[in-house]
Structures are given as structure tokens and as C-alpha cells.
Curated annotation (Swiss-Prot):
Protein name listed in UniProt: Uncharacterized protein L65
Lineage: Viruses, Varidnaviria, Bamfordvirae, Nucleocytoviricota, Megaviricetes
Ranges per topology, Intravirion: 353-355
InterPro entries xref list: Pox_virus_G9/A16
Membrane topology: Single-pass type I membrane protein
Organism annotation: Acanthamoeba polyphaga mimivirus
Transmembrane segments: 332-352
All ranges on the Virion surface side of the membrane: 22-331
Region (Disordered): 288-317
Annotated Pfam families: Pox_G9-A16 (PF03003)
Signal peptide feature range: 1-21
Residue positions the entry lists as glycosylated: N20, N78, N87, N156, N159, N274, N320
Length: 355
């Protein structure tokens, strides 16, 4: 959803669907009669000449946003004399006039072409025309020129009189371009300031933006502050392992566009682990792009005595491993041999006693 246009907003003025393509008002031309004239050409926000939307002298509106039928003035931002659009000298071209007081020729009525249902507000990117209050004149783009580009030749309902506003000032416009705001990219007023081109122009812009809004913008999944990735940072970068970034349409820095992810994703549930001869095997789990150093040495586990004797600890052989193994294999035969030996000795003793 695009933002509403408010009085006192700084904007870029565009003619998006002219016979010459998408046009942005970019400068002023100088004439012999002493009055400057707005000029426009195909270009980007970096070429744009920003304007401020103001309430005309003698008017007041309770609503802060510009609405269909409101009177506005377009005042050049980079003009110490507050030059504004003016229906002036009669030669048929839109002028810039300085320090204009109450004057109908400087006042323009907003005519939204397709207003939304039950909403008369003007939105950024929405198409509209302007009508001069003093005369029936629609500003109409005639062609790129160093002298004048915007004609006032009466009423005009062609594509050349269709206008559109983009959010300013320039830093705001760059951010909207980097966020791939469609009113900036269709048609293209952004050039290299596109978040999807990975040109590098948007790296700092998007990083600073995501540091401020964090997860309130779900498309910041690749560019969140480092504290949001502490659990996984030892395994790999977010563009390789974080589900807020991988396989999403999130904003990315140029270094994240074609990541080299050599990550082994290990997930072992010890409760479901079915092992045998655990005390005779060393298990080593390594997750990440490379082996990680062993953790700090902790206390050596010791056997605990259970009802059936000492409980072996995995990885540590029993203290008397050899004797335990010996008796577990030959204990029964040793006992039988001892019994037989006792019987034989007893029999021999009885024999000699009876003699």
C-alpha cells in the first residue's frame, strides 16, 4: 500500500506515460523574458528537481493529506526565491514565478483520474491531472527541451497530461528504489538503486534501514543486526543457513546475492540415538563449513555404583577391563575346576585315613 501525499511533502513530479516515455521534471530552462520554465526528460530520481506541495495563499485545509479537488502549489525546493509553477506570460508554456502571493494563476486543482472507492486522498504513484484555477489549462508534457517542456494549451485529456508524484527527498527516494517499490521501478526511475540488481548501491541504504526496523519488515531477514544471528553465526552466514533469508525475497547486500554455501547441516536427537558398544567408540560431530576447535576441558566423568556394581561411562573403559573380561568368559569353568579339585583332595584324604 502506497502512502498518502501530505501537504508540505517533498516530491518528485513525473509524467509517467507520455509519448516520449516516462518523464521526470529535472530542471528549469531560462528565457529572454526573464521567467524560468520547468523542463523534463527521461531520467532517474538523481536527475529529479524536487518540489514541495503547499497550500495556496488564502486557503486552509483541516485534512493534512492532499485530496481530490484540493488546490495546491508546487514550490521548488532548491530555490531561494520560492519559485512555483505559474500560468504566466501567455506564450503557452508553464513558468516558474518567485515570491507569489495570493494569485489564482499559481493555484492548481488536483484531478485524480481513478479515485479509490470512498477515498478521495491522493496517493504516491496515483495518476492525476492538474487544472489551473485562473484558466482551463492542464500542464501537458510536449517534449524534452532546455527551454521549456510543459505546455499550457488549454484542456488536455491525453496521456501527456497524466502526472504522478514520487516520495522525496532524494534519500527517501533512494530507499524506496532499493526496496523495489513498484511506483519507482514501473516505469524505472531508479537505475542502479535497485535492491534486486546487487549493484552495491543499496548495501548501506538497506543495512541502515533494517537496523532500524528489524523484524517489523519481514524482508529484512538477511540484513538484521548481528545480535539476531548469534545462535547460528558459528555455523555460517544468514544467506546460507537462516530461514529468514534463505530462499526468500528478502533484501540483500551485493555480497549476499550469490553466496558460496558449503555447510553441512547436522541434526542429531540424542533421545532417538540407538547405539551399541558406546564405551568402545568415539563419536565426533562437526557442523559448519570447517572443523571447530574442541570446547574447554570439563571434569572427567566417573563411574557411579548402581545396584549391580559400577556403571561404565561411555568412552572410558572399566578400570579392571582385562580381569572383568577374563572372568566373564572363564568364570564358570574355574568354579567347576575348583569344586572338582576339592572333591579329589577330600577323596584322597579319606582314602589315607581309612588305611
Amino acid at each position: 500500500m502506497q502512502k498518502k501525499v501530505l501537504f508540505n511533502d517533498i516530491v518528485f513530479v513525473c509524467f509517467p506515460i507520455t509519448d516520449n516515455g516516462s518523464i521526470i521534471i529535472s530542471d528549469i530552462g531560462y528565457s529572454d523574458d526573464g521567467y524560468n520554465r520547468p523542463t523534463g526528460r527521461q531520467g532517474t530520481i538523481e536527475n529529479g528537481d524536487p518540489y514541495r506541495i503547499t497550500v495556496p495563499a488564502g486557503y486552509s485545509y483541516t485534512n493534512k493529506n492532499v485530496q481530490n479537488g484540493n488546490m495546491i502549489r508546487l514550490v521548488r525546493v532548491n530555490d531561494s526565491k520560492n519559485g512555483c509553477w505559474y500560468n504566466g506570460s501567455g506564450d503557452g508554456w508553464l513558468e516558474i514565478r518567485d515570491y507569489v502571493g495570493p494569485d489564482w494563476r499559481a493555484d492548481w486543482t488536483v484531478q485524480i483520474i481513478n479515485p479509490a472507492n470512498n477515498d478521495n486522498s491522493l496517493y504516491y504513484g496515483q495518476h492525476f491531472r492538474l487544472m489551473n484555477r485562473a484558466q482551463v489549462e492542464n500542464p501537458t508534457f510536449q517534449g524534452p527541451s532546455d527551454f521549456a517542456s510543459i505546455a499550457l494549451w488549454g484542456s488536455n485529456n491525453t496521456n501527456n497530461s497524466v502526472m504522478m508524484l514520487l516520495n522525496g527527498p532524494l534519500d527517501t527516494a533512494k530507499l524506496e528504489c532499493c526496496k523495489d517499490n513498484p511506483i519507482f521501478t514501473q516505469p524505472d526511475y531508479c537505475a542502479n538503486y535497485r535492491g534486486t540488481t546487487c549493484s552495491g548501491q543499496c548495501d548501506d541504504i538497506l543495512s541502515n534501514y533494517c537496523a532500524q526496523v528489524t523484524t517489523t519488515d519481514p524482508k529484512c531477514g538477511c540484513l538484521l543486526p548481528a545480535s539476531f544471528y548469534t545462535q547460528n553465526s558459528a555455523i555460517g552466514p544468514p544467506e546460507c543457513i537462516d530461514d529468514r533469508c534463505v530462499d526468500t525475497n528478502s533484501y540483500r547486500k551485493s555480497t549476499q546475492c550469490h553466496p558460496n554455501c558449503q555447510i553441512v547441516d547436522c541434526d542429531i536427537n540424542i533421545n532417538d540415538f540407538n547405539g551399541t558398544n558406546i564405551n568402545k567408540i568415539v563419536y565426533e560431530q562437526e557442523c559448519g563449513s570447517k572443523s571447530t576447535p574442541n570446547g574447554p576441558n570439563g571434569p572427567t566423568p566417573t563411574p557411579s555404583n548402581g545396584p549391580n556394581g559400577p556403571t561404565p561411562v561411555p568412552g572410558i573403559p572399566p578400570a579392571n577391563g582385562s580381569s572383568t573380561s577374563f572372568f566373564s568368559r572363564y568364570g564358570l569353568w574355574i568354579i567347576i575346576a575348583i569344586i572338582l579339585l576339592i572333591v579329589i583332595i577330600s577323596a584322597v584324604g579319606i582314602y589315607f585315613y581309612l588305611r
